[in-house]
Amino acid sequence: MAIQMPDINLALMLPEIVISVVAMGLLLASAWWEGAEGARRIRRIAAGALMVAMVITLLGVGATQSSTFGGMFVNDRFAAFMKVMLYLSTLLPMVVSWVYLEKSKLGNGEYFVLTLFAMLGGMFMISSGSFLVLYLGIELLSLAIYVLAAYKRDDLASNEAGLKYFVLGSMASGILLYGISLIYGVTGSVDFATINAYLQQDHHSMLGITMGLILVVSGLSFKIAAAPFHMWAPDVYEGAPTSVTAFMAAMPKIAAFAALFRVLVEAFGPMHATWGPIMALLAVVSMGVGALAGLGQSNIKRLLAYSSIGHVGYALIGLAVGNQMGYEAVLVYLTIYIFMNVGAFGLILVLNKEGFGDQIEDYKGLSAKRPGLALLMAIFMFSMAGIPPLAGFMAKLQIFMAAIDAHMYTVAILGVLFSAVSAFYYLKVIKTMYFDEAERAFDMPMDFLSRAIVGVSGILVVLWGILPGSLMASVAETIKSLM
């Protein structure tokens, strides 16, 4: 019997090829390029590779062929949009962390190589047309982040964060793999298109495939830190170096949400009646945990961990809705979340490089000494709380409107209530900056690139809250390519 080779078009994988070649080349170069100057050279090349990959991705939008390797690798408009978000959620935290990494003696070459490998795994997750590619992408991303979380080798909290993330992440990967095996056992395929075709036929028993789907969703929920699969997030966010926390707070979530879109919409679209309520339940639990558990936090990184759990819950509402309006709301929310996250962590890193800034009380009187920094932090906190007219309000409004349009009134009402509760801990940060008396001079410098990135993030958070038209239009075209 002749073996039929799948169609192979490596041009569709050019961004992945660029990143993988550069990452492996820099891994070898780091053995020779030692010291601070070598690390600077490696980080510049890594940042350059990210920008090259972004340009290639943008130039490839609208290509006639959208898949290769027999449909296992997909490069459609949705993939391009999510990859651009992935590049931004990698490049921006990397750049704002440069000074922090140098002062903390963490910025050697391997750090940036691991960052590239983690992002490469995310790129494969976004372009997956098969559970095989999806799982390989998840493992590549996860293994790199396990090491990054424990990168501060002399710090017990960092070591604990890396080990805890590794142990729980390994368990989540096992659950995901078992779910994939159940799905394969029923459908006879791991390709999303084949699974979708199978589900459109009339079958008497769906128990096996339903159990498999629940396990797959559970595994992916761990990656986005959705409750009740969130137990790792607060400890890992707090213990990992702040530069790593800034990176892992957004980048893995972008990749995992893209994977959820691929699995739920492309493979299991006909089963929305089954997975829709599961997503709604995860959304409500995540919003509740994020809002209530964050109230008693005094560590700002731990607070932002619970904040991110809550934000994941709001985004999951859009997935639960299961139509174009809901999916568009998810992408709008994720895009805005990237810039809120980069801005907030960029300001935390300014203080961290001077040896403080982990505790909320470290921000006492910041407005009196550095009014510009305090204003930017207030913008990001107000936006995360969903206060108009900022982008965070517009993002939550889109989510709640989609839920109401789908008659998910209970979920929408709970979302509004939990959003109001979570506003208390965002306001606690603002109150500390503006109404408490300063205990230090806050005379730390801020490099030009960090100022530019945090400043532009603040401008976008304000601008998209008032004029969201361009973002909404881009997202609408992206979702049309997925439906």
UniProtKB/Swiss-Prot annotation:
It holds the Pfam family Proton_antipo_M. InterPro entries: NADH-Q_OxRdtase_suN/2 (IPR010096), ND/Mrp_TM (IPR001750). The chain crosses the membrane at residues 8-28, 45-65, 78-98, 106-126, 131-151, 166-186, 206-226, 241-261, 275-295, 303-323, 330-350, 373-393, 399-419, 452-472. GO terms for cellular component: plasma membrane. Its EC number is 7.1.1.-. One of its GO terms (biological process) is ATP synthesis coupled electron transport. Its main location: membrane. Signal peptide: none annotated. The keyword Transport applies. It is found in: Cell inner membrane. NCBIfam families: NDH_I_N, PRK05777.1-3. NDH-1 is composed of 14 different subunits. Subunits NuoA, H, J, K, L, M, N constitute the membrane sector of the complex. Belongs to the complex I subunit 2 family. This is NADH-quinone oxidoreductase subunit N. It comes from Magnetococcus marinus (strain ATCC BAA-1437 / JCM 17883 / MC-1).
